[in-house]
């Protein structure tokens, strides 16, 4: 299973209606090619800086960090969106985001 997981992409870049997105489990990074095996363990930067500034020219959509209130969170620049609403916890819920419309859906 570990071999299979290491073969998965770290992030996915896509463009919808002229807007560029990066999708990842916990944190996105610049779209340069990652060469280090260590990247899979540690990423490439400071998480707080990522939350504040994001990745230039992209909107990053991630999970992993449950925002306060179990709602989809956006940074002040609007280029980082955290969708983890704690659905694995008793007080959590599943948060979904429609990229085309920006609609937030909670289950």
For the regions a language model picked out, list residue spans one by one.
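Acidic, His/Gly-enriched loop-helix segments that form or flank divalent-metal centers
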Residues: 1-82, 86-92, 99-107
């Amino acid at each position: 299973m570990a071999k299979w997981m290491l073969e998965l992409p770290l992030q996915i870049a896509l463009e919808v209606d002229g807007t560029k997105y990066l999708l990842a489990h916990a944190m996105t990074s610049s779209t340069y090619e990652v060469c280090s095996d260590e990247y899979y363990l540690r990423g490439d930067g400071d998480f707080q800086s990522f939350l504040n500034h994001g990745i230039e020219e992209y909107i990053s959509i991630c999970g992993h960090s449950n925002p306060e209130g179990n709602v989809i969170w956006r940074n002040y620049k609007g280029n980082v969106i955290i969708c983890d609403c704690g659905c694995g916890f008793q007080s959590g819920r599943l948060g979904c985001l429609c990229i085309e419309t920006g609609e937030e859906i909670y289950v």
